[in-house]
Amino acid sequence: MSGIDKEELSDKEQEISRLKDVARKSYDKNTVRSAIDKLTMYGKDGIKPITDIIEAPVVDESMKEYGLNAIKRIRIFTPFNP
């Protein structure tokens, strides 16, 4: 059995992965902000990718703060399901 390839990923997973990859490599604040905003719409599935983005060395400090605030919003507005 081989590893997971792109065809096996759902459209949602592919979009999340694409947004994360684009934002982690971007020096443009608008690109990073847009990716974080879109990932926020995925609720708790967006938390890990946003964390990966704000840990990237090329991401500006203001965008790191923006990402942390986005994670806080997700945690506040996403119902807890044990």
What do the predicted segments below correspond to?
Residues 1-11, 30-44, 62-79:
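Structural detector for internal amphipathic alpha-helices that build alpha-solenoid repeat scaffolds
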Residues 39, 54-57:
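Generic structural signal for hydrophobic core residues of well-folded globular domains
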